[in-house]
Design a protein with these regions (language model features):
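Ser/Thr/Pro/Gly-rich low-complexity linker/stalk segments immediately outside membranes or between
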Residues: 23-38
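Surface-exposed, charged secondary-structure patches
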Residues: 84-130
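Cystatin/cathelin-like cysteine-protease inhibitor module
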Residues: 48-50, 115
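Short, solvent-exposed secondary-structure junction/capping segments
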Residues: 38, 57-76
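Short Lys/Arg-rich amphipathic alpha-helical segments
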Residues: 28-31, 44-48
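Short beta-strand edge/turn micro-motifs at domain boundaries
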Residues: 115-119, 131-165
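Hydrophobic membrane-insertion alpha-helices, especially the h-region
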Residues: 5-20
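N-terminal alpha-helical signal peptides/signal-anchor transmembrane segments
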Residues: 37-45
Length: 165
């Protein structure tokens, strides 16, 4: 009886340990981070400046001190700081009455220790029930680097159609 109980406890511990390894793996952490950022970028109606600041803080914290932003169709290639990127995002959000951002098909590759490559489909829906309603899906690419146990965005490749709105 003690042996069966011991085996059950060991199997339970192995199962919990395996689940924790999966849940806390770098790939899953990155996917959860990107999903949370998509929620932060979404907007439902008017927002106070305090709400905007609270929503943009996780975005700003996720961006490296110098982030390379590339828009291949425009031959745009620039190194931007987190504050400037959040200002661009706030300006983009302010032009929309409401905005829903969802990341789908998030593919995470860890080519080497401390480096990550992310490819995702960004699904943007804005201005529902408005004359200027739009719904678009675009492929975006990101490069991440791990610094002090946190993943930071170092490079973003965005399509022109996503930037021009």
């Amino acid at each position: 009886m003690k042996r069966k109980c011991f085996i059950a406890v060991v199997l339970l511990l192995v199962g919990v340990g395996g689940w924790l390894l999966y849940y806390l793996s770098d790939q899953q952490v990155i996917k959860r981070t990107f999903t949370a950022l998509a929620v932060s970028l979404s907007k439902d109606g008017e927002e106070t400046p305090v709400m905007i600041a609270l929503k943009m803080k996780p975005v700003k914290d996720f961006i490296a001190p110098a982030c390379e932003v590339t828009v291949p169709e425009r031959n745009y290639h620039e190194m931007l700081e987190p504050g400037l990127i959040t200002h661009y995002l706030i300006a983009y959000r302010s032009r929309q009455a409401n905005l829903h951002v969802a990341l789908e098909e998030i593919l995470v590759k860890i080519p080497s220790k401390g480096r990550g490559e992310v490819s995702a489909l960004v699904h943007v829906t804005a201005n529902y029930n408005q004359p200027d309603f739009f719904e678009e899906t675009h492929r975006v690419m990101f490069s991440l680097q791990k610094q002090e146990k946190n993943w930071l965005l170092h490079k973003a490749t965005l399509p022109d159609a996503l930037v021009r709105r």
